[in-house]
UniProtKB/Swiss-Prot annotation:
Catalytic reaction(s) noted: L-glutamate + ATP = L-glutamyl 5-phosphate + ADP
Official protein name in the record: Glutamate 5-kinase
Lineage: Bacteria, Bacillati, Bacillota, Bacilli, Lactobacillales
Organism: Streptococcus pyogenes serotype M49 (strain NZ131)
Cystine pairs: none
Subcellular location: Cytoplasm
Chief subcellular location: cytoplasm
Family membership: Belongs to the glutamate 5-kinase family.
Gene3D superfamilies: Acetylglutamate kinase-like (3.40.1160.10)
This protein's GO CC annotations: cytosol
Amino acid sequence: MMKRQFEDVTRIVIKIGTSSLVLPTGKINLEKIDQLAFVISSLMNKGKEVILVSSGAMGFGLDILKMEKRPTNLAKQQAVSSVGQVAMMSLYSQIFAHYQTNVSQILLTRDVVVFPESLANVTNAFESLISLGIVPIVNENDAVSVDEMDHATKFGDNDRLSAVVAGITKADLLIMLSDIDGLFDKNPTIYEDAQLRSHVAVITQEIIASAGGAGSKFGTGGMLSKIQSAQMVFENKGQMVLMNGANPRDILRVLEGQLLGTWFKQIEEVRHD
């Protein structure tokens, strides 16, 4: 029987999606953010190095500006995200401070990690922050990112961004929190007999074909982007856990080896009992 072993994991990237931070009503889930800050601070106190990739700028902005739905106009989307990013970081800073943990903000665009000079700079920034015991909180710089073909600077969504961050920081593990329990063999919202995949060693065409669907009205990510992120993690010889973010304390249980979520790790590196 395969056993998850995370004893040697030191550097962890945790990605949390908008659906985990914003309630269905559009209000901010303060309890969830507090639990997340507690878990990350606890890990830091145990000697772990944690980087948080956080969506939510759009959700926070919609809440602050009392908007019912995401604007369709790009400029307005960027404006809402810009307002929301400030509010989100302010809240993170306040709540993490309660646990005596300092945070910083890193906003990225895709071109930053494409060019060697800027990639070296951002890598050094991560290393400096981590060495100071600070939790870098990463998001895409939505206010300036564009996806036009002649000057594409968007990552697409924060699922992919988290995989990129895990790669450039050489993280031991990416934990992706979502509103789903993990990867199923078929759509659990349609098929009652859908089974959760505990371990995925190879991203097959069958898995890619079965993944799809849109994210929530507040976010952009779906299952396909999570599968693509796992593929990126595999290319960097890393590992990833996709799990439900309803209870952030489950992160601690996963690191203890409990079989929550779906573990993405290539088979040649898997240990057996």
